[in-house]
UniProtKB/Swiss-Prot annotation:
Disulfide bonds join C39-C90, C53-C78, C61-C122, C79-C138, C92-C150. This is Seed allergenic protein RAG1. It comes from Oryza sativa subsp. japonica (Rice). Keywords: Allergen, Disulfide bond, Secreted, Seed storage protein, Signal, Storage protein. Residues 1-27 form the signal peptide. GO terms for molecular function: IgE binding; nutrient reservoir activity; serine-type endopeptidase inhibitor activity.
Length: 163
């Protein structure tokens, strides 16, 4: 009888140890693989975020002619700015914040129909697709989107929350 209690106690300790280790691993996983409270403008990326990417996205949206050396420099600068956002989880947030800034600059609302023009020759959906695809083009990691495309691209009619 006493040996059964010892075996049961040992098994209970083993199970509790395994559960404690699993909980610690899950907590570490959540901390590493999810956006934190620090993913905000002025904290994880500048308040006026990604100025070269703003230029690039607007040029892409209107389908400006042949690429020039200046355009290549804008691409490189944009990719450097996007890579400089230290936390991969925050990159889509920085792009979303950038789009919000573009809309404010143009006097457009943040939410709207994807086919609506935000400026001559540029529809909202095209502008958002150009921004959402930058991580893939720049080959920077974003852990929250398939194929390097920001998750909010899949929901063009859903207003973005902004940051």
């Amino acid at each position: 009888m006493a040996s059964n209690k010892v075996v049961f106690s040992v098994l209970l300790l083993v199970v509790l140890s395994v559960l404690a280790a699993a909980m610690a691993t899950m907590a570490d996983h959540h901390q590493v693989y999810s956006p934190g409270e620090q993913c905000r403008p002025g904290i994880s990326y500048p308040t006026y975020s990604l100025p070269q990417c703003r230029t690039l996205v607007r040029r892409q949206c209107v389908g400006r002619g042949a690429a020039s050396a200046a355009d290549e420099q804008v691409w490189q600068d944009c990719c450097r700015q996007l890579a400089a956002v230290d936390d991969g989880w925050c990159r889509c947030g920085a792009l979303d914040h950038m789009l919000s800034g573009i809309y404010r600059e143009l006097g457009a609302t943040e939410a709207g129909h994807p086919m609506a023009e935000v400026f001559p020759g540029c529809r909202r959906g095209d502008l958002e697709r150009a921004a959402a695809s930058l991580p893939a083009f720049c080959n920077v990691d974003i852990p929250n989107g398939p194929g390097g495309v920001c998750y909010w691209l899949g929901y063009p009619r859903t207003p973005r929350t902004g940051h």
